[in-house]
């Protein structure tokens, strides 16, 4: 097990039965992303939705809120999930939808641009971002693009499309950086490198060997090591 604070951006780790990738280390917390998306769902399929691309009223938010509440398996895991603020600005950075504080949410378009070199390509599905293509503009009657939301292709490219379509769910979390997490390729720092936990065959047993025999073997090995630096006649080579 390792402290989350010690993991570099781009490192994948296990938490609450899921795999996450570290995006960045912050003051006392780590911003992380689900390593692969979960099942698909519409961003918003509500018939009475006025602005379908407003995350605060979306089907996607309801699904993610339920997912994050069910995610932790222990009280320690639950306490490690910290609330964070999400910027719901649209593509031109207008702020009609404001911000929202949650425990899990998709990345914004700008976070995707910031971290895309660290994000593993999504293997099975396209997935939603949280950023709307456009917000309702009070001085314009045009509302068509208030149905559009940004999403990411499996190859890492990104585009926007109608919120009624179903794409993958790939939330980000903010976790307490003191959290102990496991790694699939983990080798404990204080391990010998030969025992079972390192994948080796274990150390030989010393049961039944006398102290005198052990001391004799130590002396023999010390003399043999010394011959590397001395000639056959005992002088320096």
Regions found by a protein language model. Name each.
Residues 192-234:
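Short, low-complexity, charged amphipathic interaction modules
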Residues 1-193:
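Collagenous Gly-X-Y triple-helix signature in extracellular proteins
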């Amino acid at each position: 097990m390792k402290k989350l604070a010690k993991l570099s951006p781009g490192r994948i780790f296990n938490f609450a039965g899921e795999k996450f990738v570290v995006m960045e280390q912050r003051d006392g917390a780590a911003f992380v992303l689900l390593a692969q998306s979960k099942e698909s769902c519409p961003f918003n399929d509500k018939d009475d939705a006025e602005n379908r691309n407003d995350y605060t009223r979306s089907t996607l938010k309801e699904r993610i809120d339920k997912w994050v509440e069910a995610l932790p398996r222990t009280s320690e895991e639950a306490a490690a999930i910290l609330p964070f603020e999400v910027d719901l600005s649209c593509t031109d950075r207008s702020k009609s939808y404001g911000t929202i504080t949650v425990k899990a949410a998709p990345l914004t378009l700008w976070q995707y641009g910031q971290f895309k070199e660290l994000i593993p390509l999504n293997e099975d599905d396209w997935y939603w971002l949280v950023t709307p293509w456009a917000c309702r503009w009070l001085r314009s009657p045009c509302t068509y693009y208030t149905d559009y939301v940004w999403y990411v292709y499996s190859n890492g490219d990104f585009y926007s499309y109608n919120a009624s379509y179903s794409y993958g769910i790939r939330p980000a979390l903010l976790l307490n950086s003191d959290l102990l997490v496991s790694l699939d390729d983990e080798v404990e720092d204080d391990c010998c490198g030969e025992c079972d936990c390192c994948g080796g065959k274990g150390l030989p047993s010393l049961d039944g060997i006398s102290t005198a025999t052990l001391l004799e073997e130590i002396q023999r090995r010390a003399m043999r090591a010394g011959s590397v630096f001395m000639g056959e006649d005992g002088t320096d080579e």
